[in-house]
Swiss-Prot record:
Gene3D superfamilies: 1.20.5.1300, Nitrogenase molybdenum iron protein domain (3.40.50.1980). This is Histidinol dehydrogenase. The lineage of its organism: Bacteria, Pseudomonadati, Pseudomonadota, Gammaproteobacteria, Vibrionales. PROSITE patterns: HISOL_DEHYDROGENASE. The active site is at E323 (proton acceptor), H324 (proton acceptor). It comes from Vibrio vulnificus (strain YJ016). Its cofactor is Zn(2+). Its EC number is 1.1.1.23. Zn(2+) binds at Q256, H259, D357, H416. The gene is hisD. Keywords: Amino-acid biosynthesis, Histidine biosynthesis, Metal-binding, NAD, Oxidoreductase, Zinc. Binds 1 zinc ion per subunit. Catalyzes the sequential NAD-dependent oxidations of L-histidinol to L-histidinaldehyde and then to L-histidine. It catalyses: L-histidinol + 2 NAD(+) + H2O = L-histidine + 2 NADH + 3 H(+). Belongs to the histidinol dehydrogenase family.
């Protein structure tokens, strides 16, 4: 890990060390994904079978996972695993249930009533990556809010073979359809539909560069589907003072570093002693990890920043805007009102990032790459949409008419003006 003293750097140097690595889409990825999308749109299920065999080296008997297969997968899980998944489900459901919006109804002036109502997005698609380890936690983070929001149709795609844990959580979340398909072809299938896969309105979930690019492309096509948020490498920033536990900090940094070689890992502290202790602790703990080689690559570009105060540490964090922000200080809650840009915040020694990743109740689908300045943690609102309603009485329109007419005249929109005056004239004729 590289250690730098913030005050010793010029403004240009400060910007440079906090700059994230470029997300390399590359013309080859863009073109390859466009080709996959076009093929799925043209050939439907046949393309899904062909591409699954090509990329996943598996020839599934069926694209859709049957109810029987889901039941059999559930039966194979241990009681311990089921209990863990069910507790995580309960906590996530409790937190997301609390996010249900309150209807708004306001009389802005006599006879003019304005409302805001919320409706679920009707059809949503959930993408769950494959890889060496199953990600049932991601199914929970996407499936639970979709269930609570009341989405009419929830579709899940994941590369085959789909892990038993994923299928069990799909059952917990009452997901309607599960498909043995991954990669850009899964995104295309959900965005445009095939003979088997339902076309959805919005697609959620992480993935590799090809999945990310496929989501970008379908979201830019009005015939495609909306997506949850832009994606980039995973990140953690830790703010720590001299009271922090160096072993805890090291464990948190490594839990992020093991995600991948492009993971962003940053410690900001006013304590040189803590910086040194964390450096030593990271090296000791690294040797115990099964994914040490991956974590080591991430650590090669990681940072320890020596700030002159906690106030400056907060300022650095707000500028960087991390996906995960861990605060290990004497009074962490005192800093919370000062923290503006972060996907999810973990306060105090006993709040590891892992808790939020799996089971505390918050959502682990978070903005990265500095998007925390404008994007939020995934939540119930992302599976819903707002509509406004207005209802004017005759007297309400009569009282509001002069304002609307004056503004319509100023904008030169005669038909807008006439839509009001024609009504006022009829009211006048009746009286």
């Amino acid at each position: 890990m590289r250690t730098v003293v913030w005050q010793s750097l010029s403004e240009t140097q400060q910007d440079a060390i906090l700059e994230r690595p470029a997300i390399t889409e590359g013309a080859n990825i863009t073109a390859a994904v466009a080709e996959v999308i076009a093929k799925v749109r043209a050939e439907g299920d046949a393309a899904l079978f062909e591409l699954t065999e090509k990329f996943d080296r598996i020839k599934p008997e069926s694209i859709r996972v049957t109810e029987q297969e889901i039941e059999e997968a559930s039966a194979r899980l241990t009681a311990k695993m089921k209990q863990a998944l069910e507790q995580a489900y309960a906590n996530i459901a409790k937190f997301h249930n609390a996010q249900k919006p309150t209807p708004i109804k306001v009389e802005t002036q006599p006879g003019v009533v304005c409302e805001q109502v919320t409706r679920p997005i009707q059809k949503v698609g959930l993408y769950i990556p494959g890889g060496s380890a199953p990600l049932p936690s991601t199914v929970l983070m996407l499936g639970v809010p979709a269930q609570i929001a009341g989405c009419r149709k929830v579709v899940l795609c994941s590369p085959p073979p789909i892990a038993d844990e994923i299928l069990y959580v799909a059952k917990l979340c009452n997901i309607d359809e599960v498909y043995n398909v991954g990669g850009g072809q899964a995104v295309a299938a959900m965005a445009y539909g095939t003979e088997s896969v339902t076309k959805v309105d919005k697609i959620f979930g992480p993935g590799n560069a090809y999945v990310t690019e496929a989501k970008r492309q379908v979201s830019n096509d009005f015939r495609g589907a909306a997506i949850d948020m832009p994606a980039g490498p995973s990140e953690v920033l830790v703010i720590a003072d001299e009271t922090a536990d160096a072993d805890f900090i090291a464990a948190d940094l490594l839990s992020q570093a093991e995600h991948g070689p492009d993971s962003q890992v940053v410690l900001v502290t006013p304590s040189v002693l803590i910086a040194d202790q964390v450096t030593d602790a990271v090296q000791k703990q690294l040797k115990q990890l099964s994914r040490a080689s991956i974590a080591e690559k991430a650590l090669a570009s990681s940072l320890i920043i020596i700030a002159d105060s906690l106030t400056q540490a907060v300022s650095i964090s707000n500028y960087y805007g991390p996906e995960h922000l861990i605060v290990q200080t004497k009074n962490p809650r005192e800093l919370l009102p000062l923290l503006d840009n972060a996907g999810s915040i973990f306060l105090g020694d006993w709040s590891p990032e892992s808790a939020g990743d799996y089971a505390s109740g918050t959502n682990h689908v978070l903005p990265t790459y500095g998007y925390t300045r404008t994007y939020s943690s995934l939540g119930l609102a992302d599976f819903s949409k707002r509509m406004t309603v207005q209802e004017l009485s005759a007297e309400g329109l009569k009282n509001l008419a002069p304002t609307v007419v004056t503004m319509a005249e100023a904008e030169g929109l005669d038909a807008h003006k006439r839509a009001v005056t024609i009504r006022v004239e009829k009211l006048t004729a009746r009286s």
